[in-house]
């Protein structure tokens, strides 16, 4: 290893710890927020080409609770990547913002930049997509879930500046497409511009960095470390890292390693760490796993 390795910018520990606590509180709020709150997710169905009826009739392809849905709420039509919703006569389906759906309507997925959120009783719904795959799902959440009030974040390791480390960004000559297995058995493809190299436990370690979109202002890290055999989620954790500066340096704060969505809901499409991101290191920082992960 070379000798030149800058230290992270110094921080005042009390301020650092307070910022971390605020980050934890904001994370808890996001997890129970309608539209995006993983804890509220109660259904996920992959949408096949053609017609998919949904409602409370147990013989339908997508079955919803009868307290929220009539026997047939509507039919989802998929043609390629285009999705249309045909409501049944008198269906209580609404656009989430309040307009009733009375005729066949195009639905934008949550990767289209024009997401259509639906409401049916206490349920919210939208079409969900993942990067690098043409698979689409109907995602359903319960806005009246008692978990909005009762949910608590899992414990985390004590916050420590020791796990705030400088990393060198090593870009590839050209960005690469890297496929990640997901918990459903499928594959998700992300763009990776390069790798982050950091030092811990007297050695250098590498993590493949991912950009979730061309507009990303941070790297998305999907990682595993040896604490997964003891305290943290067995399948790995996620982490957001600021983009490298003009000198190709950034700071990784492992205190903010967090559980993937599949820890809190079985109705997810979580990407799993690739072999390149399995660290031979115990990262004793960040979120631990709950007593009973959902997946």
For the regions a protein language model found, what residue spans apply to each?
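Mid-length scaffold segments of soluble, non-membrane domains
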Residues: 69, 75-80, 189-232
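A short, sequence-level motif marking secondary-structure junctions
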Residues: 67-69, 107, 130-133, 209-216, ...
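N-terminal pre-domain segments of enzymes
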Residues: 2-43
């Amino acid at each position: 290893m070379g000798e030149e390795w800058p230290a992270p910018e110094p921080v005042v520990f009390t301020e650092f710890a307070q910022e971390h606590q605020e980050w934890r509180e904001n994370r808890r709020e996001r997890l129970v927020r309608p539209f995006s709150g993983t804890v509220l997710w109660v259904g996920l169905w992959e949408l096949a080409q053609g017609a998919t009826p949904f409602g409370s009739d147990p013989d339908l392809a997508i079955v919803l609770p009868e307290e929220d849905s009539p026997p047939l709420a509507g039919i989802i039509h998929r043609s390629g990547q285009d999705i249309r919703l045909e409501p049944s006569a008198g269906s209580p389906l609404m656009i989430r913002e309040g307009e009733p759906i009375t005729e066949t309507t195009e639905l934008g997925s949550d990767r289209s930049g024009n997401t259509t959120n639906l409401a049916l009783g206490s349920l919210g719904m939208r079409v969900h997509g993942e990067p690098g795959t043409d698979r689409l799902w109907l995602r359903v959440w319960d806005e009246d879930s008692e978990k909005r009030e009762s949910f608590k974040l899992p414990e985390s390791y004590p916050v420590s500046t020791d796990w705030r480390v400088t990393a060198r960004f090593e870009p590839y000559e050209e960005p690469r497409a890297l496929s990640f297995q997901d918990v459903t058995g499928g594959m998700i493809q992300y763009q990776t511009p390069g790798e982050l190299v950091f030092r811990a436990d007297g050695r250098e370690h590498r993590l493949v960095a991912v950009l979730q979109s061309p507009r990303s202002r941070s790297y998305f890290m999907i990682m595993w470390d040896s604490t997964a055999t003891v305290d943290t989620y067995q399948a790995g954790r996620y982490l957001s890292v600021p983009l490298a500066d003009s000198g190709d340096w950034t700071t990784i704060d492992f205190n903010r390693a967090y559980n993937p969505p599949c820890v809190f809901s079985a109705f997810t499409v979580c990407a799993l760490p690739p072999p390149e991101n399995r660290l031979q290191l115990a990262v004793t920082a960040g979120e631990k796993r709950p007593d009973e992960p959902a997946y």
